[in-house]
């Protein structure tokens, strides 16, 4: 597995070794031992999630607070998405910075997003299926998020018009509101 560093040290792009011929392809999408070797510490995933979304759907930017924070290993298994991780660790040198990556069924890349990051994605293809592993269970009372168009973060989305958001995602906080409300620490 090839590891590609991003502008934020702790966020990694993982690129599998793909074996292909006229029959199709094969690749190992996850190997616990290899993954922990890359990170340098043990990780225990407890939940796998799978979503299907239409073009222009924007999901996020989500995170869970406190003891329910989650590390995530994400990938797009059908179609393509623009995937984003935002550093919300107040003491981090990259606090408020973001990383954006094209994840697709074609490139088969995965993005490692550690605790302390908000995460979201924009569907670029007609349909996208998105799968991710988490190190903590979903906990509705700890669910939180940052609005996709927060001017302080200034994510350079591939498009900003015609987006489809859930009512919940339309009401998310700005980073400054999260700080003022003490929802990140």
Curated annotation (Swiss-Prot):
Binding site for substrate: 23, 28, 47-49, 59, 72, 119, 143, 168
GO cellular component terms attached to this protein's record: cytosol
Catalysed conversion reaction: dTDP-4-dehydro-6-deoxy-alpha-D-glucose = dTDP-4-dehydro-beta-L-rhamnose
GO molecular function: dTDP-4-dehydrorhamnose 3,5-epimerase activity
GO process annotations (BP): DNA damage response; dTDP-rhamnose biosynthetic process; lipopolysaccharide biosynthetic process; O antigen biosynthetic process; polysaccharide biosynthetic process; response to antibiotic; response to UV
Active site per the UniProt annotation: 62 (proton acceptor), 132 (proton donor)
Protein role: Catalyzes the epimerization of the C3' and C5'positions of dTDP-6-deoxy-D-xylo-4-hexulose, forming dTDP-6-deoxy-L-lyxo-4-hexulose.
Protein name: dTDP-4-dehydrorhamnose 3,5-epimerase
UniProt organism field: Escherichia coli (strain K12)
Gene, per the UniProt record: rfbC
């Amino acid at each position: 597995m090839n590891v590609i560093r991003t502008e934020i040290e702790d966020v990694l792009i993982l690129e599998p070794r793909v074996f292909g011929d006229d029959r199709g392809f094969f690749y190992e999408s996850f190997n616990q031992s290899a993954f922990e070797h890359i990170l340098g510490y043990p990780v225990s995933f407890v939940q796998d999630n799978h979503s299907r979304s239409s073009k222009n759907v924007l999901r996020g930017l989500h995170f869970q607070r406190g003891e329910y924070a989650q590390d995530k290993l994400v990938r797009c298994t059908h179609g393509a998405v623009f995937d984003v991780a935002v550093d919300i660790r107040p003491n981090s040198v990259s606090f408020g910075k973001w990383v954006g990556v094209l994840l697709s069924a074609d490139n088969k890349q995965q993005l490692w997003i550690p605790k302390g990051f908000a995460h979201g994605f924009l569907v670029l293809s007609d349909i996208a299926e998105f799968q991710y592993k988490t190190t903590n269970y979903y906990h509705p009372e700890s669910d939180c998020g940052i609005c996709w168009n927060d001017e302080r973060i200034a994510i350079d989305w591939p498009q900003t018009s015609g987006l489809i958001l859930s009512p919940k995602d339309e009401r998310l906080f700005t980073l400054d509101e999260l700080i003022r409300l003490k929802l990140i620490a």
